[in-house]
From Swiss-Prot:
Protein's gene: rpmD
Family under the similarity heading: Belongs to the universal ribosomal protein uL30 family.
Gene3D superfamilies for this protein: Ribosomal protein L30, ferredoxin-like fold domain (3.30.1390.20)
GO molecular function: structural constituent of ribosome
Annotated coiled-coil segments of the chain: none
Pfam families for the chain: Ribosomal_L30 (PF00327)
A GO CC term assigned to this protein in UniProt: large ribosomal subunit
Organism this protein belongs to: Lactobacillus acidophilus (strain ATCC 700396 / NCK56 / N2 / NCFM)
Keywords attached to this entry: Ribonucleoprotein, Ribosomal protein
An individual GO BP term: translation
Quaternary structure note: Part of the 50S ribosomal subunit.
Entry protein name: Large ribosomal subunit protein uL30
SUPFAM superfamilies, A to Z: Ribosomal protein L30p/L7e (SSF55129)
Length: 61
């Protein structure tokens, strides 16, 4: 099973409201904040909508 390490590299300020909600829902706050989430279809779908704001790495357990 793999997890995804997601880091916010660009600010969500001045972005579409939907994109800001996704950033908040993923648990990201400020720039350079990082979360580890399970690799599943729901997470991948959310990441595609904010791909220009984040950096993603796969972590093997």
């Amino acid at each position: 099973m793999t997890d995804l390490k997601i880091t916010l590299i660009r600010s969500a300020a001045h972005r579409l409201p939907e994109q800001r909600k996704i950033v908040k829902a993923l648990g990201l706050g400020r720039v350079d904040s990082t979360v580890v989430l399970p690799d599943n279809a729901a997470t991948r779908g959310a990441l595609l909508k904010i791909a220009h704001l984040i950096s993603v790495e796969e972590i093997n357990k």
